[in-house]
């Protein structure tokens, strides 16, 4: 059965979700809603400064997109309740505007005829978050779910492997995070986050992130044990998590590497990766795993106190897991 998907919001994540869906036979994008006109939408889909040209054909006909010969309905509605998803048979909406992140607001998609909704960002209420490699097995039929954040998708699988094998007493996370659309090209007004208003290409910017605390929501056994922060850096894509933890059960760094490698080759294949190469951030542009453990970058002070490093393409990896969650809730 092909799952019919509508995308609301055709920004960075909306477009990368669309691109990733073209490589899957189980998911078909049938509709896109954004306030862009169709010609500009086609242009934004065709050309991408980070991920290159779209691999396929993109045309506009009668105000709609024709991608690889298939028509995709284009609308420009501000209110999701008016989207008439049922007219094109939408099963699941990928809510990618970054605006409708509560059950109450996202439920407008259900009103408009969709069966289920996946939020492509952490929910702002108690809407459950699901992360592949962490808690997909806890899904219990909810019609509105969140795929959490790109950083939580990197941290949670790694934290789960470490906690399951050695136990985590407590930990601090830092994500060295690529620039995103919320930042400023030059210094500009940012009333809630003064540092965040400084020029993205000129600065390393300390920032807050709820990603580590959110791990406690997807892995309740780690609730209250992790917190973290971010540094925004002047790179266009690919971020890296630095997780420093105290272990319950003493372990050498070699034992930790072996446990992560076993998980990456076993139950977490496609989610958690493992490398012993001398890699840098651009080596992960286009990476579909949401967390690639860098065995050479981590260090241990002793057998109870370690720093672990894991890479993620904060656009591609996350967007692929949005599709995995869509498939999972459609079973």
UniProtKB/Swiss-Prot annotation:
Pathway: Carbohydrate degradation; glycolysis; pyruvate from D-glyceraldehyde 3-phosphate: step 1/5. It catalyses: D-glyceraldehyde 3-phosphate + phosphate + NAD(+) = (2R)-3-phospho-glyceroyl phosphate + NADH + H(+). SMART domains: Gp_dh_N. The keyword Transmembrane helix does not apply. D-glyceraldehyde 3-phosphate binds at residues 149-151, 180, 209-210, 232. Coiled coil: none annotated. GO terms for biological process: glucose metabolic process; glycolytic process. Its EC number is 1.2.1.12. The record marks 177 as: Activates thiol group during catalysis. GO terms for molecular function: glyceraldehyde-3-phosphate dehydrogenase (NAD+) (phosphorylating) activity; NAD binding; NADP binding. It holds the Pfam family Gp_dh_C. It comes from the Bacteria. It is found in: Cytoplasm. Keywords: Cytoplasm, Glycolysis, NAD, Nucleotide-binding, Oxidoreductase. Homotetramer. Catalyzes the oxidative phosphorylation of glyceraldehyde 3-phosphate (G3P) to 1,3-bisphosphoglycerate (BPG) using the cofactor NAD. The first reaction step involves the formation of a hemiacetal intermediate between G3P and a cysteine residue, and this hemiacetal intermediate is then oxidized to a thioester, with concomitant reduction of NAD to NADH. The reduced NADH is then exchanged with the second NAD, and the thioester is attacked by a nucleophilic inorganic phosphate to produce BPG. Belongs to the glyceraldehyde-3-phosphate dehydrogenase family. This is Glyceraldehyde-3-phosphate dehydrogenase. The lineage of its organism: Bacteria, Pseudomonadati, Pseudomonadota, Gammaproteobacteria, Enterobacterales. The gene is gapA.
């Amino acid at each position: 059965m092909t799952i019919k998907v509508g995308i609301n919001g055709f920004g960075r994540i909306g477009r990368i979700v669309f691109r990733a869906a073209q490589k899957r036979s189980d998911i078909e994008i049938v509709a896109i809603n954004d306030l862009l006109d169709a010609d500009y939408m086609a242009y934004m889909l065709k050309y991408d400064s980070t991920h290159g040209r779209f691999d396929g054909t993109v045309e506009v006909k009668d105000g709609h997109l024709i991608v690889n010969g298939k028509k995709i309905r284009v609308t420009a509605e501000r209110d999701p309740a008016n989207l008439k998803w049922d007219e094109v048979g939408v099963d699941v909406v990928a809510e990618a505007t970054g605006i409708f992140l509560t059950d109450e607001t996202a439920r407008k998609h259900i009103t408009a005829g969709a069966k289920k909704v996946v939020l492509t960002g952490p929910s702002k209420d108690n809407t459950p978050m699901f992360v592949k490699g962490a808690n997909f097995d806890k899904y219990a039929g909810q019609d509105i779910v969140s795929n959490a954040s790109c950083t939580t998708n990197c941290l949670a699988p790694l934290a789960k492997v470490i906690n399951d094998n050695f136990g985590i007493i407590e930990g601090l996370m830092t994500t060295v995070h690529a620039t995103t659309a919320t930042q400023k090209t030059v210094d500009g007004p940012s009333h809630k986050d003064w540092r965040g208003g400084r020029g993205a290409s000129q600065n390393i910017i300390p920032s807050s992130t709820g990603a580590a605390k959110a791990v406690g929501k997807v892995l309740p056994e780690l609730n209250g044990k992790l917190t973290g922060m971010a540094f925004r850096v002047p790179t266009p894509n690919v971020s890296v998590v630095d997780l420093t933890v105290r272990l319950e059960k003493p372990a050498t760094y070699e034992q930790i590497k072996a446990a992560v490698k076993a998980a990456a080759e076993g139950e977490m294949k496609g989610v958690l990766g493992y490398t012993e190469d001398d890699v840098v951030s651009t080596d992960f542009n286009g990476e579909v795993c949401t967390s690639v453990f860098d065995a050479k970058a981590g260090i241990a002070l002793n057998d109870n106190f370690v720093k672990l490093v894991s890479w993620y393409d904060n656009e591609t990896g996350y967007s692929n897991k949005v599709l995995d969650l869509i498939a999972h809730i459609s079973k």
